[in-house]
Swiss-Prot record:
Transmembrane segments: none
Family per record: Belongs to the DNA mismatch repair MutL/HexB family.
Function: Probably involved in the repair of mismatches in DNA.
Cellular component terms (Gene Ontology): MutLalpha complex; nucleus
Lineage, top ranks: Eukaryota, Metazoa, Chordata, Craniata, Vertebrata
Annotated SMART domains: DNA_mis_repair, HMG
The protein's name: PMS1 protein homolog 1
Residue span of region Disordered: 465-493
GO molecular function: ATP binding; ATP hydrolysis activity; ATP-dependent DNA damage sensor activity; DNA binding; enzyme binding; mismatched DNA binding
PANTHER family hit by this protein: DNA MISMATCH REPAIR PROTEIN MLH, PMS, MUTL, PMS1 PROTEIN HOMOLOG 1
Organism, as annotated: Homo sapiens
Complex and partners: Component of the DNA mismatch repair (MMR) complex composed at least of MSH2, MSH3, MSH6, PMS1 and MLH1. The MutL-beta complex is a heterodimer of PMS1 and MLH1. Interacts with MCM9.
Ranges of the DNA-binding region feature: 571-639
Length: 932
């Protein structure tokens, strides 16, 4: 064996600590927070691989500590391992800066309150200082990492795809949001390629911080909580969704908005997340268990009970009193949402399968399936209630419970397709004892189904009957006594016996199989297996009808709308088989993948259509054939009704032949029938104008009186007007002598031209919008409300393009350099906007400037472009006006000066008398003496 070189050891250990861009940002932000920073700016270039800069206003690094500030295992946080029991800082290992130095080029600029100026240090791969120089930055520390992973080409290649780079940006934004919520008084700005991705200002408390991150609409559905356990010294606080909240705001398909903090440290704790999600889904989301609640949980425990030195990124911790924390959290959830309907404590959920809720729907977390549910007359497999911890029985239905009572029970039998759910529930309500007798496989689906046709049906716990007479068709009426006996024996069954799988028996004495793969029967060749919604009519089709190919045209080009307008009747156009398949599966696909665009979702579902078997495609081809027949019949009916209406007027009835020919004849007939009326109206107007007589009116007129009045008016005009008169220049480029009726003054023509240029740019200049690498999604949380989004939705838009996207064409947006795309959703309320292009000629131009434009439109009722220019654009246009005015010739002719004065008079009047710098156009010299 040989000892590895020191440089190799540093590189290997550093690549384990710094694994991505987000890990660099996390380490540097934690150092900033440990230094007491209240403002943090994070700037990235090329997704952080070219440059990462984190600037704060913390205490700074002392000059005596600078030589070892980036050396590994040098830290000011702790002195020995015993200090970990009282740890109050984020960092403690002293590895972050040293590890970053090994895989990037690092510059550190720092200044303390005692320093007169800041100092910039250039570090080498070992953390030693190569050079230093003074800097202009204020108090705090700025760490810049250049060329990340410069000596790890494989690691850099891993992030070469655009998707992985965008995922890193998303992770960094989520990290900054976590710290922004945890530290309400912390100001955060996140910039990528000079474009502001996300920012948060200082706020007063956690509620305002959550509102700035999640939005007002989400916080209106949240409620605060506090819980304190003196015995275990556990303190819980935060915000949870209300029981009656709008779950479209408080639920997500991913846990990215489930914030958990332990001792002010953002962590990932699966057990805590699972417990909260379990309570939330059972009490608030009975129709789905796949969603994650939006919540903020802050857990404070003694520092000695937490081990944070578990993973390199410190995102996971070990709790010494984990069970106490879970019990306290369960008590809190019970207080907020009430007790669970099936279990008494969280521990019962972890013991064995018998103590878990058996959920057999498309939204279940398990893959357990009931099998052998047939329609051949056999009853449902008998299950002993002694091993199922449910206290509900089937007698609840006898007391007049309606179908909604089924939703409170814990056994769910699939999703009933095409309206069978309601019929089956009604049968259960009427005949309790025969509830499971007539349920067939055609009424139960175990896979993902159509959202509009599916509903999860919950049925109460199943009784066990083992009658000696072998009756398999009915449940024994003496089930109550057997149930009591079964409950007494429930304590005798252990988890070990249950795991052997021989506890539950069916009516013939066979073991119940919890999982079984269902294979389609050969006698049903037309059965559709994609969504498992067999239609009864399809079950009786023979092989000839199944193999018969439809002549429906799948792809149609040139569609403008989905409807035809014929004879004042709106007729929906027929859809192809693939279009019907996309229409059925797109809502569920978008629910499971909310971040996928509508175009990408359609493409992925179309690819899924290509992989379907012929039997699965046959279902949609038959639907398409029926839809085409419906379309043709509606077309014929509409034309026949129109023909009958025309027959009453004495016109010949049109004999219907085909839908297309009749539509063409109808259009031709309509146009010809209106032509005589138009000719008659036009001819009558011409004849009317010809027949009108010219009226003659005599007015007394005198040329002498006209001349007298003209002279009087001319004299009055000369007295009222005080027109300036241009005399001559004074051999200076910016000094022209002018006089008015009362004074002599100097004119600076360049200032006037500067103001004229600025006014023209303000009204007409259009900033070019450059495409963004990553479009910015416009949400309510970004604008702190929905009022700004409502203004955008009301703006004009251009014609719809092939991609299905519409671009806002309002000049108040386009002239200010914003290209905003409106992407339609499943419904009108689910449309969303994103900034696809933005002007890059202004630094730090972004969403804040768009908000300034919308604020002018909303509050000042700005109609024109010049009324809603952001301050950055105004400053930019002022600079452009100055630049253009300085390009004018040094000496202007008298005609040019007169033209400038003329334009100044007609464009400004008496309103504007200064240039963009606030300097006047005219300089007063002297007043002229009055003449008598």
């Amino acid at each position: 064996m040989k000892q590895l070189p020191a440089a190799t050891v540093r590189l290997l250990s550093s690549s384990q600590i710094i694994t991505s861009v987000v890990s660099v940002v996390k380490e540097l932000i934690e150092n900033s927070l440990d230094a007491g920073a209240t403002s943090v700016d994070v700037k990235l270039e090329n997704y952080g691989f070219d440059k990462i800069e984190v600037r704060d206003n913390g205490e700074g690094i002392k000059a005596v500590d600078a030589p070892v500030m980036a050396m590994k295992y040098y830290t000011s946080k702790i002195n020995s391992h015993e200090d970990l029991e009282n740890l109050t800082t984020y960092g403690f290992r002293g590895e972050a800066l040293g590890s970053i130095c090994c895989i990037a080029e690092v510059l550190i600029t720092t200044r303390t309150a005692a320093d007169n100026f800041s100092t910039q240090y250039v570090l080498d791969g070992s953390g030693h200082i190569l050079s230093q120089k003074p800097s202009h930055l204020g108090q705090g520390t700025t760490v810049t990492a250049l060329r990340l992973f410069k000596n790890l080409p494989v690691r850099k290649q891993f992030y070469s795809t655009a998707k992985k780079c965008k995922d890193e940006i998303k992770k960094i934004q989520d990290l900054l949001m976590s710290f922004g919520i945890l530290k309400p008084d912390l100001r955060i700005v996140f910039v990528h390629n000079k474009a502001v991705i996300w920012q948060k200002s200082r706020v007063s408390d956690h509620k305002m911080a959550l509102m700035s991150v999640l939005g007002t609409a989400v916080m209106n559905n949240m409620e605060s909580f506090q819980y304190h356990s003196e015995e275990s010294q556990i303190y819980l606080s935060g915000f949870l969704p209300k029981c009656d909240a709008d779950h479209s705001f408080t639920s997500l398909s991913t846990p990215e908005r489930s914030f958990i903090f332990i001792n002010s440290r953002p962590v990932h704790q699966k057990d805590i997340l699972k417990l909260i999600r379990h309570h939330y889904n059972l009490k608030c989301l009975k129709e789905s268990t796949r969603l994650y609640p939006v919540f903020f949980l802050k857990i404070d425990v003694p520092t000695a009970d937490v081990d944070v030195n578990l993973t390199p990124d410190k995102s996971q911790v070990l709790l010494q009193n984990k069970e106490s924390v879970l019990i306290a959290l369960e008590n809190l959830m019970t207080t907020c949402y009430g007790p669970l309907p099936s279990t008494n404590s969280y521990e019962n959920n972890k013991t064995d399968v018998s103590a878990a809720d058996i959920v057999l729907s498309k939204t279940a977390e398990t893959d357990v399936l009931f099998n052998k549910v047939e329609s051949s007359g056999k009853n449902y497999s008998n299950v002993d209630t002694s091993v199922i911890p449910f206290q509900n029985d089937m007698h609840n239905d006898e007391s007049g419970k309606n179908t909604d009572d089924c939703l409170n029970h814990q056994i769910s039998i699939g999703d009933f397709g095409y309206g069978h759910c309601s019929s089956e529930i009604s049968n259960i309500d009427k005949n309790t004892k025969n509830a499971f007798q007539d349920i067939s496989m055609s009424n139960v689906s175990w896979e993902n189904s159509q959202t509009e046709y599916s509903k999860t049906c919950f049925i109460s716990s199943v009784k066990h009957t083992q009658s000696e007479n072998g009756n398999k068709d009915h449940i024994d009426e003496s089930g109550e006594n057997e149930e009591e006996a079964g409950l007494e024996n429930s304590s005798e069954i252990s988890a070990d016996e249950w795991s052997r799988g021989n506890i539950l028996k069916n009516s013939v004495g066979e073991n119940i199989e919890p999982v079984k793969i269902l294979v389609p029967e050969k006698s049903l060749p037309c059965k559709v297996s994609n969504n498992n919604y067999p239609i009864p009519e399809q079950m009786n089709l023979n092989e000839d009808s199944c193999n018969k190919k439809s002549n429906v045209i799948d792809n149609k080009s040139g569609k403008v709308t989905a409807y035809d307008l014929l004879s004042n009747r709106v007729i929906k156009k027929p859809m192809s088989a693939s279009a019907l398949f996309v229409q059925d599966h797109r809502p569920q696909f978008l629910i499971e993948n909310p971040k996928t665009s509508l175009e990408d979702a359609t493409l992925q579902i179309e690819e899924l259509w290509k992989t379907l078997s012929e039997e699965e495609k046959l279902k949609y081809e038959e639907k398409a054939t029926k839809d085409l027949e419906r379309y043709n019949s509606q077309m014929k009916r509409a034309i026949e009704q129109e023909s009958q209406m025309s027959l009453k007027d004495g016109r010949k009835k049109i004999k219907p032949t085909s839908a297309w020919n009749l539509a063409q004849k109808h259009k031709l007939k309509t146009s010809l029938s209106n032509q005589p009326k138009l000719d008659e109206l036009l001819q009558s107007q011409i004849e009317k104008r010809r027949s009108q007589n010219i009226k003659m009116v005599q007015i007394p007129f005198s040329m002498k009186n006209l001349k007298i009045n003209f002279k009087k008016q001319n004299k009055v005009d000369l007295e009222e007007k005080d027109e300036p008169c241009l005399i001559h220049n004074l051999r200076f480029p910016d000094a022209w002598l002018m006089t008015s009726k009362t004074e002599v003054m100097l004119l600076n023509p360049y200032r006037v031209e500067e103001a004229l240029l600025f006014k023209r740019l303000l009204e007409n200049h259009k900033l070019p919008a450059e495409p963004l690498e990553k479009p910015i999604m416009l949400t309510e949380s970004l604008f702190n409300g929905s009022h700004y989004l409502d203004v955008l939705y009301k703006m004009t838009a251009d014609d719809q393009r092939y991609s299905g996207s519409t671009y806002l064409s309002d000049p108040r947006l386009t002239a200010n350099g914003f290209k905003i795309k409106l992407i339609p959703g499943v419904s009108i309320t689910e449309n969303y906007l994103e900034i696809e292009g933005m002007a890059n000629c202004l630094p730090f131009y972004g969403v804040a400037d768009l908000k300034e434009i919308l604020n002018a439109i909303l509050n000042r009722n700005a109609k024109e472009v010049y009324e809603c220019r952001p301050r950055k654009v105004i400053s930019y246009l002022e600079g452009e006006a100055v630049r253009l005015s300085r390009q004018l010739p040094m000496y202007l002719s008298k005609e040019d000066i007169q033209d400038i004065i003329y334009r100044m008079k007609h464009q400004f009047g008496n309103e504007i008398k200064e240039c963009v710098h606030g300097r006047p156009f005219f300089h007063h010299l002297t007043y002229l003496p009055e003449t008598t």
